[in-house]
Swiss-Prot record:
This is Exodeoxyribonuclease 7 large subunit. It comes from Pseudomonas aeruginosa (strain LESB58). Belongs to the XseA family. It is found in: Cytoplasm. PANTHER family: EXODEOXYRIBONUCLEASE 7 LARGE SUBUNIT. The lineage of its organism: Bacteria, Pseudomonadati, Pseudomonadota, Gammaproteobacteria, Pseudomonadales.
Amino acid sequence: MRNDPFQRLGLDREVLTVSQLNQRARLLLEDVFPQVWVEGELSNLARPASGHVYFTLKDSNAQIRCALFRQNALRVRQALRDGLAVKVRGKISLFEGRGDYQLIADTVEPAGDGALRLAFEALKEKLAGEGLFASERKRLLPAHPRRIGIVSSPSGAVIRDIISVFRRRAPQVELTLVPTAVQGREAVAQIVRALQLADRQGFDALILARGGGSLEDLWCFNEEAVARAVAACATPIVSAVGHETDVSISDFVADVRAPTPSAAAELLAPNAGDLQQRLDGLRRRLVLRMRDQLLRERLRLEGVARRLRHPGERLRQQAQRLDDLDMRLRRAFERQLAVRHERLVRLETRLAAQHPGRTLALLRQKLDSLAARLPRAAREVLKDRRQRLEGLAQTLNVVSPLATLGRGYSILLDERGRAIRDAGQTQPGQRLKARLAEGELEVRVEDNHRTPVTLSLLD
């Protein structure tokens, strides 16, 4: 029992509650496995509203529950999904409430093909953003190539398949192999050099080919250096890497992607039978067009001949046209004459309505009426003016100083003819003139007294 951990901890003689047992088990696990990397496949992936991620990590024989809390889940760049192979870093712990053994993860990374797939998607997105996959930069393949360069391995079935297709379909095409490694550490550099060399040889087209394999085997065709070398080629290039289900970055950058190397050869190898059928079709189209052209020319010449042989028909047509124009001219003249006559009638009616004799009669009638109304109007005006004059005379008589003098008052004037209004304006012995209602008096001032005038109210 030397290796019994409970004996080392002295737990073989202590009775624990379930909570105590789970707590000590958790502490023991976290102490022994503070950080560990585990590789497996994701399953039972769950994302509750809290933002935490829960999943099961499994292999063919076992599984373990995992928890990835929100702050760590936000740092995971790879989209997690069931079936994804990953590497998980975390600590081994135990959920005390249920006694569940689990891995508390802080990092999740793709494993195996998953890492390669992530790199593949990243490079694909980068090159697409630069426009290397744009359709407008793709070039058409030559319809009848004479010289084709093949960038591939000199050994293996790929080059034999390509040669076989060209021998069968287009033996006249000259094929040149530009050898390169297509797998391994040196493959990327060799493929780049082979593409650059082939692009300088003046080939009509290039084939970049490799047989099938795993993702790791085909990875050199997913390297950025190879992709940029393909994009830099001035020669139209067909990418034929792997089987039909395999897709590489070079497929996206090349002008044309072929599912297999044999399919690439068929794209560039014009079939003799197809060429013969195309020539036959062109010959038939040419014959039909010549027949149509001859028929049109014959009809045109026959029409010209008919016009030349029968000038009388043309004269008859012109005479008929002249008669038609004459009739149209007569009808137009008659319509114009009717319009002018109608307009003349309207003018006569308006002129009769505005005849000077009628106007003079109306004016004379109006003048007689005014002459009859004038004496009566003059009497009314004269009467009104007389009444207004009498009213003004009465008003004037009321405010006239002569009326005041008529009531016994007088006006004193000094030697300059100025009216005396205040006793202070005179001096004793001064001579004044008193104007009465009837006549004037010469008076002399004996004395002057300035006595204020007071008014008293009668009770």
